[in-house]
Swiss-Prot record:
Family annotation (Pfam families): Toxin_35
Domain of life, source organism: Eukaryota
Subcellular location: Secreted
The protein's name: U8-lycotoxin-Ls1p
Family: Belongs to the neurotoxin 19 (CSTX) family. 08 (U8-Lctx) subfamily.
Keyword set, alphabetical order: Disulfide bond, Secreted, Signal, Toxin
Amino acid sequence: MKLMIFTGLVLFAIVSLIEAQAENEKPCLPEYKVCTHVPGNCCSDLVCDCYGRYKSGAQIGRNCFCLQKGVIYKREN
């Protein structure tokens, strides 16, 4: 009986450890994906770049996207 309880606890610990590792290894976000709420999840060659949205001079929100490092984006008219 004690052996069964011990085995069950060991199996539970192993499954919990595997699930915790899987959560830490979430896939990275590819280019142009939204990263507003997860700024550290962009793939290694990308950076989470944020832009404010304004209406009548007041900020109404913020958008963040995974973009290439060192690239400057400009608005076209």
